[in-house]
Amino acid sequence: MIFLDYIYNKVYAPVEDDFGFDDAGDMDELDDELQVEEGNAASGEGGDELYEHWKVQVDANQDPVRIDKYLADKMAYQSRNRIQQAADAGFIHVNGKPVKSNYKVRPNDLVTLMLDRPRHETSIKPEEIAINVVYEDDQLMVVNKEAGMVVHPGAGNFHGTLIQAVAWHLRDMPEFDANDPEVGLVHRIDKDTSGLLVVAKTPTAKTALGKQFFNKTTHRSYNALVWGNMVEDEGRIEGNIGRDPKNRLRMKVFDPDSGIGKTAVTHYKVLERFGYTTLVQCVLETGRTHQIRAHMKHIGHPLFMDETYGGTEILRGQRSSSYKAFIQNCFKLCPRQALHAKTLGFVHPTTRQQMDFDSEWPEDFRQLIEKWRGFIAGTTQDTFKNI
């Protein structure tokens, strides 16, 4: 039995998946754990399918057969060579352990695998766009993406994307082809989320980094401003994430035992309290589409200025006209969800050194936090007793 953990490519055309859902729309922030889902993953909170993810349950009466042949027979349009490459990269697991292509499947084995996305139907053309490269060597580059930039061409966003900017930046590197799935983006973050991303310049880097995301050995943390005064100083949010049946552009949290959606875990820690809002650090244990945004909405603390999840309403505070004016001013300072991918850590694919990066807040996020600091400094603690 093949479970529908495979996430169809939404990048170049709306497609109808097997549930009858239309996946068109601005959903750049697809699973950021490589969009590893990115079947079970980038992004981040992200971040779409850099990878296809499959889960296959072997029948109880299955005869022993090489796993590459078994999967090629079971999975339509997937070549045996492509499956062998996935095994060589460590992207095929049986019962939670990596196997090679000569492994022989056994009855009731649970097979999970990740396949590089196929070549794009639409060619990615370099565009001269300024990007903030915080680190670069012959294997990879780390970029601090600004809010408002889509990472990959998609419905309604065919120009001005991060990968097109990267293609221009690397135009003098003949071995880098933005249309080659063996190089390029390793994970993603949403259009209106700012922060750090790693780009692989070589197949070696793509495979090594992809494996780290797949095995959850990378480290990524986000800063977010959320509505409300969070009760606990730190905590863990667990709840399956799947598409909201009432709004296909939004994700919804389901009970972990419901069988709906995919397992998602977010860890948070309070950094600062502003009475009616809270600055938090979020660390992803998984990386589902809109994970932080959906989880925070689920526990009653949607991200500030997150229109999709209700964060553009005045959810906490005072009825005074001055407070309403203050909030509207905050909305203008940071006219997007207040979410920034602040840190990124991984092992370098060739030197094996630990690489850790920390980014400054972008100006809109910084001004927003300073505005709330000024607000709290001029407010008495009695104001917040009943919130």
Where are these regions (language model features)?
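RNA pseudouridine synthases
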Residues: 1-387
